[in-house]
Swiss-Prot record:
Keywords associated with the record: DNA replication, DNA-binding, Metal-binding, Nucleus, Phosphoprotein, Zinc, Zinc-finger
Lineage, broadest ranks: Eukaryota, Metazoa, Chordata, Craniata, Vertebrata
DNA-binding region range list: 184-268
Positions of post-translational Phosphoserine modification: S370
Positions annotated as zinc finger (C4-type): 466-488
Protein name: Replication protein A 70 kDa DNA-binding subunit
Annotated Low complexity bias: 124-135
GO biological process, one term: heart development
Organism: Danio rerio
Origin superkingdom: Eukaryota
Region (Disordered): 107-172
SUPFAM superfamilies found in the cross-reference section: Nucleic acid-binding proteins
Length: 601
């Protein structure tokens, strides 16, 4: 297949003129490290006539550069882009979608003799019959036909795009927003609007509110502070559609948002928000629901969307937080078509106003997954809770529950605790765990037991880990005073010690090897990993003594058990999720209850 570059496309893209699928060659690509930890890639492109270095790869396309799919000399079709004018007048073409037609190793080199594009000094495409691009060899059995971009005229003005009521800038999709744009307007529906939150500290007082916006291309979170709260809070209505322009865009903090967008918006003094009456084609919501059964395999603290039937709802309770603030909470058991049940904790006004009668359908956008008591969910300040939503997933779930789901008890993923925090419905002896083949199913099982530490292996119990806050990857000593983390792709002058213990625990009937990670390992040893690392390096005898003192101590263990396969050999792996000292009063109460049950048989 012969490919010709789209001569004149560089000039048109620079001027913001619409170009339909131009064929370009990557002349150079350079990684730019961002101050917030997110790297960007700057690309120089050629159309055979001109080159331009002000192409930027959108962050979602970074893997193409990191995996060398997009590399120097490869030939690409630019499927979607946006040209932004920076404050200093420079133009940047942000690549939103691109496809590699010929990889770099399939190309002999640069096509033609392009020169850097300078506005106002363009040279016209050659009218000579000689081709301006070297013919590319057919691949994958193609018929040798020429690949050309769709019919286009690079000098024409772009087609008219929808404008805002003020006519200041065209409406763009949310998915195309990025910090390099200076003029843009989106038309989006408000799917969630928070209450006003206030704060007071040494730097003064303040307030904020946030909202989640959606259009047909994607979603984004917007936050307003202080003056913008006064200006916009009363105007914004959940469910309504608005034209929004001139917000500040920055990298999104994924710790507090589950929205599928690399950026988030901050309202500022120049922001304009205008109601939109023509809103029928703007979607109501974007959710990516995860089955309750699949929550077993998700990482702790993941923010996700879930939908289920309210199988049971506890009464609302009032609790005191660490900062002496009283809040409302309500625990709800959700079941879905997987037959699994999980506990959802709702907070604040959601907990107070929820009515669980009639087993309503609950859809939660942005719930946090926890491993407290097995697996459980909790709503956040930013979560959206929908009761009996008008969406296909809700109707399908209602039909299933009314027909057959109501008769299921369901297998709970959450350990249900009784009054006082000491009760637990999944107490097992170690012999029962083996006799009942816990962990042999498709999903892991959780159980609690009271057991005594018999032995802890101290060999290889400590490792040098990345010092970054959210990374625990093992580092490699570079032998030059620096330590390299492959995950973060950085070198550090220091590291942190992490624990991974292998211990043998026993009760009156059996014993079991278990694995303990950082927090539970520190509980068992009674020392933190940093101190243990110092002892290991400076005082081996004191280090050994810590392990000796840990033996024959008894704890309440909460464990995860799963049959895992290594090199075609299957074995049970038990991981300690939590370890606490025994509350002998609660333990005695439970033993008395069990004795009475046995006596009544």
């Amino acid at each position: 297949m012969t490919v010709r570059l789209s001569e004149g496309a560089i000039e048109s893209l620079s001027k913001g003129t619409e170009v339909n699928n131009p064929i370009l060659q990557c002349v150079n690509i350079r990684k730019i490290d961002g101050g917030n930890g997110v790297s960007r890639f700057r690309v120089m492109m050629s159309d055979g006539l001109h080159t331009m270095s002000s192409f930027m790869l959108s962050t979602q396309l970074n893997p193409m550069a990191e995996q060398n799919q997009l590399a120097t000399n490869c030939v690409c079709v630019l499927k979607r882009s946006v040209t932004n004018v920076l404050k200093d007048g420079r133009r940047v073409v942000v690549i939103l979608d691109i496809e590699v037609l010929k990889s770099a190793d399939q190309m002999p080199g640069k096509i033609g003799d392009p020169t850097p594009y300078v506005e106002g000094q363009s040279k016209a495409p050659s009218t000579a019959p000689a081709p301006t691009a070297r013919p590319l060899q057919p691949q994958n059995g193609s018929d040798g036909s020429t690949y050309r971009p769709s019919a286009q005229s690079f000098g024409k003005k772009p087609m008219a795009a929808p404008n805002t009521p003020g006519g200041s800038s065209k409406v763009v999709p949310i998915a195309s927003l990025n910090p390099y744009q200076s003029k843009w307007t989106i038309r989006a529906r408000v799917t969630n609007k928070s209450a006003i939150r206030t704060w007071s500290n040494s730097r003064g007082d303040g307030k904020l509110f946030s909202m989640e916006l959606v259009d047909e291309s994607g979603e984004i979170r917007a936050t307003g502070f202080n003056n913008e709260v006064d200006k916009f809070f009363s105007l914004i209505e959940q469910g309504k559609v608005f034209y929004i322009s001139k917000g500040t865009l920055k990298i999104a903090n994924k710790q507090f948002s589950s929205l599928k967008n690399d950026y988030e918006m901050t309202l500022n003094g120049e922001t304009s928000i205008i109601p939109c009456e023509d809103s029928n084609d703007v979607p109501m919501l974007q959710c990516d629901f995860v089955s309750i059964a699949d929550l077993e395999s998700r990482e702790k603290d993941t923010i996700l969307d879930v939908i289920g039937v309210c199988k049971n709802a506890e009464d609302v309770a009032r609790i005191m937080t660490k900062n002496s603030r009283e809040v409302s909470k309500r625990n709800i058991q959700l079941i879905d078509m997987s037959g699994r049940v999980i506990q959802l904790t709702m907070w604040g006004s959601d907990a107070e106003t929820f009515d669980g009668s009639g087993q309503p359908i609950l859809a939660i956008k942005g719930a946090r997954l926890s491993d407290f008591g097995g697996r459980s969910l909790s709503t956040l300040y930013s979560s959206t809770v929908m009761i009996n939503p008008d969406i296909p997933e809700a109707y399908k779930l209602r039909g299933w529950y009314d027909k057959e789901g109501h008769a299921l008890d369901g297998q709970s993923m959450t350990e249900l605790r009784g009054p006082g925090g000491g009760g637990n419905t999944n107490w097992k002896t170690l012999a029962e765990v083996k006799n009942e083949h816990l962990g042999h199913g498709d999903k892991a099982d959780y159980f609690s037991c009271i057991a005594t530490i018999v032995y802890i292996r101290k060999e290889n119990c400590l490792y040098q880990a990345c010092p970054s806050k959210d990374c625990n990857k093992k580092v490699v000593d570079q032998q030059n005073g620096m330590f390299r983390c492959e995950k973060c792709d950085k070198e550090f002058p220091d590291f942190k010690y992490r624990l991974m213990l292998s211990a043998n625990i026993a009760d009156f009937g059996d014993n079991q090897w278990v694995t303990c990670f950082q927090d539970t390992a520190e509980t068992l040893l009674g020392q933190n990993s940093s101190y243990l690392g110092q002892l290991k390096d400076t005082n081996e005898a004191a280090f050994d003594e810590v392990f000796q003192h840990a033996n024959f101590n008894t704890f309440v263990f909460r464990n995860r058990v799963k049959l895992e396969t290594y090199n075609d050999e299957s074995r049970i792996k038990v991981t300690v999720v939590d370890a606490k000292p025994v509350d002998h009063r609660e333990y005695s109460k439970r033993l008395i209850i069990n004795i009475r049950k046995l006596a009544a048989q």
